[in-house]
Design a protein with these regions (language model features):
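Cytoplasmic helix-loop-helix junction between adjacent transmembrane helices
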Residues: 109-147
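Short hydrophobic/alpha-helical segments at membrane-entry points of transmembrane helices
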Residues: 19, 104-110, 214
Length: 279
């Protein structure tokens, strides 16, 4: 087998590793902030529980809006260019947390951060998928998603620990540092050239009856999990179990990490249905 052919069949390549690191940094920042944001709004701006919850979920509002057209942007502009520009937007948004000294400004920053984050995560996923061999697609996607799984353990636990020991500004500094690292990695990652073709945007790009059941299923799962991570910090403080909140995310990540190594190969061999039934 030639060197070129061997490289084309390899799963762990420099492009894949850089994309993995960008994804891990992005999700770590997300979990660092989402876990502490409701309490930050309540303590810093005397927000109600509802407003504090929106301070956390405003990020998701921005991300949801961006998801509607992020795929089109990646196809039209290109994977690498979209990744770099969106990471710049994320870095700017992250820096704006420091001067955002009112609740409305915090909402705006959270929405802007979510917009950039959603486009960046779509672009980095496209970069990773472009170098995963077809016959190892599910396995490679599972390994790539390990970054998200690890972030669910490290991000919330680190966010809670930093807040309790050094305050909210320290969390923002750590998050900004990770964002800058992600931008630096995004600048050096090499994405394969894309085929030049005309791309048009239509309602069919974002709405398709065939995927509606899957979307509703993920919606319910996401709502349940987001509710937990948004208010877990405040709840654990109220009942005197601050350390227990960190263990929750650790247990979640350990189980997810183990399953990632198993389910990707199982999906490649047995198909999608068995994974859905098990989950």
């Amino acid at each position: 087998m030639s060197q070129t052919s061997s490289e084309s069949q390899s799963l762990i390549t420099p492009t894949f590793v850089f994309a993995w690191l960008v994804n891990f940094a992005q999700f770590t920042v997300f979990y660092l902030l989402v876990t502490i944001m409701a309490m930050y709004a309540i303590e810093q701006f005397q927000a109600s529980d509802t407003a504090g919850g929106f301070a956390s979920s405003a990020f998701v509002v921005g991300a949801t809006i961006a998801r509607l057209f992020s795929g089109y942007i990646v196809d039209a502009v290109g994977r690498k260019r979209t990744l770099v520009v969106s990471l710049i937007v994320v870095t700017i948004a992250m820096a704006l947390y420091f001067p955002a000294q009112s609740l409305p400004l915090l909402f705006v920053v959270r929405i802007l951060h979510g917009l950039g984050y959603a486009i960046a995560s779509t672009a980095v996923m496209a970069v990773a998928q472009s170098v995963i061999p077809d016959h190892r697609r599910a396995e490679g996607t599972g390994y790539f998603a390990l970054g998200t799984t690890l972030a669910t353990a490290f991000g919330p636990a680190a966010g809670l620990a930093i807040v309790h020991n050094a305050g909210y500004n320290a969390v923002f500094i750590v998050a900004l540092t990770l964002t800058v690292v992600a931008l630096a990695l995004g600048l050096v990652v090499k994405a394969p050239a894309q085929e030049q073709r005309s791309v048009t945007f239509s309602l069919g790009n974002i709405v398709h009856p065939a995927v509606a059941p899957f979307g509703v299923f993920i919606l319910f799962v996401g709502v349940a999990y987001t509710g937990i991570i948004t208010f877990l910090n405040g709840y654990s403080s109220d009942v005197g179990l601050e350390e227990g909140a960190s263990y929750f995310f650790l247990a979640y990540a350990v189980v997810s990490l183990f399953l990632r190594f198993v389910l990707g190969k199982l999906q490649d061999r047995r198909g999608d249905n068995i994974i859905i039934y098990l989950s």
